[in-house]
Amino acid sequence: MKRTILFFTFTALVFSLSAQNSVVIKLNEHTKYRGYNTMEAFQKRRSVNIYETRDLSLQDLSDLLWAANGINRPENGKKTAPSAMNSQDVDIYVSRADGTYFYNAITNDLVLVTTEDLRPLMDGNRPLGTPVILLLVSDMSRYKNYSPGNAERNKHFFEMGAIDAGIVSQNISLFCAANDLGTRPRASMNQVALRKALNLKESQVMWLNHPVGYPK
């Protein structure tokens, strides 16, 4: 009995310390009306290579993430980006100078994953100097019939994850075009180092990254 009490006391202490040490950035409520209209956004859409170095404002970052894959129907938890079978398999990691964060659409905040700036692992030999890089990761385990370690059976989920990530990527591109922000979708990145730094599971696939900033 004493061992059981000690175990739960220790577990609660560890959980408490972990919660105290966690860093969370609360995002703003998204802006309902802003930017150019849809057809103007399509007209302005382009891949940007030259950026200013100043940070994104909290409102711009909040609106960007909501547009990318935020919850637009709170009554059922559905998102701005559709996903196969409503799996909601795509997660967004936000890498900045002060660390890399996980975007939690449910609580509308950023949760620190690592204090390491992982942007160089996505910039490679062609750094753009953007204040933010968004990493799109599909978690195949959210599909109902996902089978761990069974590559052949999971092939369809792998393909659907790629499509779902592409939809989120398009949301990012169109939001940026509509709001005078710059971005470009990229597939190149140091996947081995990123997987280790973010402690990703086997079921999680990194598909694309988006540098985002104010174009010069």
Language-model-derived ranges and their functions:
Residues 199-216:
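A glycine-rich helix N-cap at a beta->alpha junction
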Residues 109, 148-149:
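Core catalytic architecture of nucleotide-activated donor-dependent transferases building glycoconjugates
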